[in-house]
Amino acid sequence: MVMHVISPILLFFAENFSHVNLIIEQGNTSSKVAVYNKKHMEASFVYKKFDVDELESLFGKYDFEHGILSTVIGKNEVLNDYLRGKLRRFIFLDETVKLPITVQYETPETLGKDRLAAAVGANYLEPGKDLLVIDAGTAITYELIEASGAYLGGNISPGMTTRFKALNF
């Protein structure tokens, strides 16, 4: 199955809110943003650099009520404060957010939010199945989810660019 540009966990949250939602996923090399109105994606954007300036532009075009931010680059208080001040409901995805899966990873506070997002999203899209989720981005991650919804963990390896550089391509 080919995954969406925006991680499926964020779709889980988008589909469980009504009205217009702002969905932000900050990865290692880019930030992906989607605008959802109920269950329909109205727009999506990819940014190399994403900050409050980009948010102000988006808020000028859309009337957001809810939002979620998933990031692997660490908490940005300026960005978070801006979103908290503008949105009726804002979720910063971290290990304290109640999820529809059971995380059996030994140290959930060290688990990359991209990996957690992939596990929740896959389970949401394919409930009741044993799943191996592979995400090929800056890194390649492998996540194992049981049919019961238990996330067992996974593995992370260098992405394709790093692999080719290592082989002098």
Describe every region a protein language model picked out.
Residues 50, 74, 110-117, 162:
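Conserved active-site and cofactor/substrate-binding residues in soluble primary-metabolism enzymes
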Residues 1-3:
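Methionine residue identity
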